[in-house]
Amino acid sequence: LSRDYDISVQGQAYLLRPDTPREGIIRQPRPGEADGQLSEPLRSQASEANLIMRPPGVTPNTLRILEATEYAQRQGIFMEFHHAAYQAYWEDGLDLGDLAVIEGLAQQVSLNSTELMERLESSFYTNTIMEQYQQALGYGIRGIPTFVVGNLLFTGAHPYEIFTSAISKVLAGENS
C-alpha cells in the first residue's frame, strides 16, 4: 500500500490473550481445522488476502514479541520485522514467545539483537505496550488484526481492494 499511496503504517500493540502464561500453551485444534488448515471463516479470509496461515502448535504469550515490534518500529523497520514475525508464526510454526526466536528475527532484519535482548530482559517497553493495549480496549477493539484508516475501523484479514477502497475514501474526504 505504501508503494501505491503516500501513507505510513504505524503498529500498535494488542494482547489478544493477556492471560497466557509466559511460556505459552499448547494450542488445541479448533472445530473445522484439519490437515494443517485453519477453520472457516479464517481460512477463506486468509485465502482472499493471499496469506499463508497454518494452525500453529503453540499459543504464545505475545508480550515480548510486541515489545520487540515496538523496538523495531522505533528503529524504522516495523514492517520488515512484522513480516518476519508473521512468517515465523503463521508459515513456519515458530513460538513468538521464545526469546531465541525473537533474537533470530531481529538478526534476520538487521536489528541490534544484543540491544533488543537487553531491553526485553529489562521490560523496557512493557509500559508502552500496556498503554497501547488499554487504548485499543478503550476504542472497543477486541480482535486482531484491526486496521484504522481515517475514521474507518475494520478487523480481520481482508483483500487488498478493501484497503485501497478505504484509503481512497479517506483521501476523497469520505472519512466517516
Regions found by a protein language model. Give the residues of each.
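Short, structured active-site "lid" loops
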Residues: 26-48
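Conserved active-site segments centered on acidic
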Residues: 52
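Dinucleotide-binding Rossmann-like beta1-alpha1 core, especially the glycine-rich loop
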Residues: 30, 56-63
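Short, charge-patterned binding micro-sites
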Residues: 13-24
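Conserved N-terminal beta-strand and adjoining loop/helix that marks the start
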Residues: 64-68
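C-terminal cap of thioredoxin/glutaredoxin-like
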Residues: 1-7, 11, 30-33, 70, ...
